[in-house]
A protein has these predicted regions:
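Proline/serine/threonine-rich low-complexity linkers at boundaries of modular beta-sandwich domains
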Residues: 21-31
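Surface-exposed, short loops/turns at beta-strand junctions within beta-sandwich domains
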Residues: 96-105
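Aromatic sugar-binding surface patches on proteins
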Residues: 83-96
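Extracellular acidic, Ser/Thr/Pro-rich low-complexity tracts
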Residues: 50-59, 114
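Structural beta-strand segments of beta-rich domains
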Residues: 45-49
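Short beta-strand elements
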Residues: 116-128
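Sec-dependent bacterial lipoprotein signal peptides
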Residues: 1-21
């Protein structure tokens, strides 16, 4: 009887530890740089979006990094960033190809998603 009780308790503890130890992991946004400057070569303003993202399991698990910019009128601009280096995801766009205006205030949402559907998001703002 003692052996059966010990076995049952050990199975219960094992099940509880296995279930309680699983912690879903998600990407981790740890740096953001957004800038706008005039580029004489293109005769236009250039927007530079840079986001540094890590993943606790593997960097290759990061599927996408997106930036959403909202102006004071509620208009939204969206950019899908590309990986460029170990942690860096970035995009460089000409202002004429966007509805952005250098010097305006923008609320910014950044979302990093991995292949398992877990996300990290960061909210910030831009004002030149």
């Amino acid at each position: 009887m003692q052996i059966i009780r010990f076995f049952a308790v050990s199975m219960l503890l094992s099940a509880l530890m296995t279930a309680s130890c699983y912690v879903p992991v998600s990407p981790d946004i740890f740096g953001v740089h957004i800038s706008c400057h005039f580029n004489e070569g293109y005769d236009d303003h250039m927007w530079i979006f840079q986001v540094w993202v890590d993943h606790p399991v593997q960097l290759q698990d990061i599927r996408e990094v997106e930036i959403y910019l909202y102006n004071a009128y509620g208009e939204m601009s969206y950019f899908d960033l590309r990986p460029d280096g170990t942690y860096l995801w970035n995009e460089v766009v000409l202002e004429q190809n966007t509805n952005l205006t250098c010097g305006r205030w923008y609320d910014i949402d950044i979302v990093a998603t991995d292949y398992y559907g877990y996300t990290d998001d960061l909210q910030t703002y831009y004002q030149k």
